Amino acid sequence: MAVTSHHMVPVFVLMSACLATAGPEPSTRCELSPISASHPVQALMESFTVLSGCASRGTTGLPREVHILNLRSTDQGLGQPQREVTLHLNPIASVHTHHKPVVFLLNSPQPLVWHVKTERLAAGVPRLFLVSEGSVVQFSSGNFSLTAETEERSFPQENEHLLHWAQKEYGAVTSFTELKIARNIYIKVGEDQVFPPTCNIGKNFLSLNYLAEYLQPKAAEGCVLASQPHEKEVHIIELISPNSNPYSTFQVDIIIDIRPAREDPEVVKNLVLILKCKKSVNWVIKSFDVKGNLKVIAPDSIGFGKESERSMTVTKLVRNDYPSTQENLMKWALDNGYSPVTSYTIAPVANRFHLRLENNEEMRDEEVHTIPPELRILLGPDHLPALDSPPFQGEIPNGGFPFPFPDIPRRGWKEGEDRIPRPKEPIIPRVQLLPDHREPEEVQGGVNIALSVKCDNEKMVVAVDKDSFQTNGYSGMELTLLDPSCKAKMNGTHFVLESPLNGCGTRHRRSAPDGVVYYNSIVVQAPSPGDSSGWPDGYEDLESGDNGFPGDTDEGETAPLSRAGVVVFNCSLRQLRSPSGFQDQLDGNATFNMELYNTDLFLVPSPGVFSVAENEHVYVEVSVTKADQDLGFAIQTCFISPYSNPDRMSDYTIIENICPKDDSVKFYSSKRVHFPIPHAEVDKKRFSFVFKSVFNTSLLFLHCELTLCSRNKGSQKLPKCVTPDDACTSLDATMIWTMMQNKKTFTKPLAVVLQVDYKENVPNMKESSPVPPPPQIFHGLDTLTVMGIAFAAFVIGALLTGALWYIYSHTGETARRQQVPTSPPASENSSAAHSIGSTQSTPCSSSSTA
């Protein structure tokens, strides 16, 4: 025993040493309990609905549109009544930019503050907001508020009275919507010719153009494993179903909303989200007022919000090796280096999650990510250092390159003009780095690359300091613009990239009535020709937290950059002359539309969801309304997918790069329609295909991408229009790239109707219903076939009768020897008696003789 105890002492000492050196190991034990308000992740159900309403095209011939919102009080007992409403205004799908004056009647049971947010509504157009007494309207855009007026009115409260009041005042009403007070109301302005001529209020008014958003908290369970906030946090969110319908196959977006738990101080995090759902969903990540790095891991598709909804530098990683249980998922996170796990949340039903982050007080102020000094050139003149050397010709004071650079030739300028005005609304691009090759899943926070941008009315030139580029470990990397063919040139000190204003992937938007902001990006990637991804791990890609492009940016648009680091830059110019050689993306004077029809007559489009069965024809008509007669369009791609997101491609391709891929595709000729408006015309393209049910789901989506082209001569902005036959043989990569810059995607839902087997579902056809028999039972036989069958049956019957008579006549002698009748019955047929008598003459004489 003494020996045993003597050897046990070192064992205990060794165990104690191991525990002491290991430190506090992150716990993977999670005791699930219902979450409270203090839990960092909250589950919610977002719904969109209205009480009643209507829409019409009655204001088409009038000088203004009229939209009415009649708000009702919410249920009492839910706390303080709501005092603020955000009104989101966008054009309808068939209108790219809305230019018509509008009157909004905003009636509410209590005074409200209306926050108006607009997208693609032209500036300088008069708009009138009539509000209830005590309500005010606030505008987020300064240009929009210059021509917007607000007046207080006393409105009738009942729907019909309010509608009649507006019709009497303005002649007609474009839309009327009754809804409960909500935080967010979404109204799409514009007039569609498919609307009825008058507005008749209905209870079951459902339209994607007029909706209110409601958020309802949902029950969830979870645990918090780290009580104190850290610089790095890992949150695991598991969702059972995005809706309460267990049979729904519609892929929905699950929104993760990330914000600080308190307004200040500023929150800086290295955040990891591990997302899991048993059904196929699309995770949409939105971050507000949180700086740092965000990594999202999920087995499904991952998207991100608009540029204004991306405050963090984000990385996404698709992993399909998730374990099934909660304990194993926690262990999986630790085994893959995602530790310590901060929280775990599981929700039975939800379509939105709010993640609220606490500030890490231990982080020092100098660790807050700021814009590098080299990029202050993009902030504006107040942030720029003074140059030691005088500016060269045409250069902005304090805004030129930090190295000698030859003058850029400029055409169309007069001597002494202000050649490059300062941008009125400078935009700060967010900068990203390539991941470290040793740790490809990490994204670095700051960047020290000297970047200078210069532009004139012909081109943009961006220069990257070679020393700062190589100092940060990017030696041997390749620099291009968004168009990979636009590569950097080198001089002694800098990489120089040059782009015309209408090429190399450059986009633009109007920042003021006389200003244009041009955007492009520097793509940093390995020049290896054998590996198209450039990543050690092919699934991970990097997206800019704010790419500077207007509108939504989806996965399809960022896919070409998913393998590279991206540095976004921009330049603002005053539009001295009408730009030649380019037009707004999907020209503002061109409006696209797509409709589905049941027949090849293309008379009445199918409203709502289009019903289709196996082997049935689907007739598609796409059109463009335009003013330029030389402007044409093409159907670039059409495919059917079980997903509503057009960026998720499928194998069921109908048309690809204008060339038909489905053998059943048939094109139809159509005439060009001229409008009474001067120089306005409508071009149409029609085609059909035979639907094949290749997906095991009842709801599918037809996605078609349309692109502009030039009828006469192709340019760098627009390719020359080609026929489908030519596209199948002569389309090259340059034309495809140009088409992608001017595409517009339309989506139409398809309801798959299954063919019913009558024998299985209707066992007794006569008793259950008078439905006629299934069509395969002689339903399609013509008259000649039926007569042939009847004649054949008659011949067969005659032959059978003759055969029976032959058998009977040859067996009659034996039967009569057994029994000879003395006289025929009186009831026998005379012909039968005559026949029998004639056959018995000889036997009778023989019998009498015997």
UniProtKB/Swiss-Prot annotation:
Record's comment on post-translational modification: Extensively modified by glycosaminoglycan groups (GAG). Phosphorylated in the cytoplasmic domain by the type II receptor TGFBR2 at THR-839 to mediate recruitment of ARRB2 and subsequent internalization of TGFBR2 and TGFBR3.
Cystine pairings recorded for this chain: C54-C199, C638-C704, C659-C728, C709-C721
SMART domains, sorted: ZP
Keyword Zinc-finger tagged: no
GO molecular function per UniProt: glycosaminoglycan binding; PDZ domain binding; SMAD binding; transforming growth factor beta binding; transforming growth factor beta receptor activity
Cytoplasmic side of membrane: 809-850
Name of the protein: Transforming growth factor beta receptor type 3
Organism: Mus musculus (Mouse)
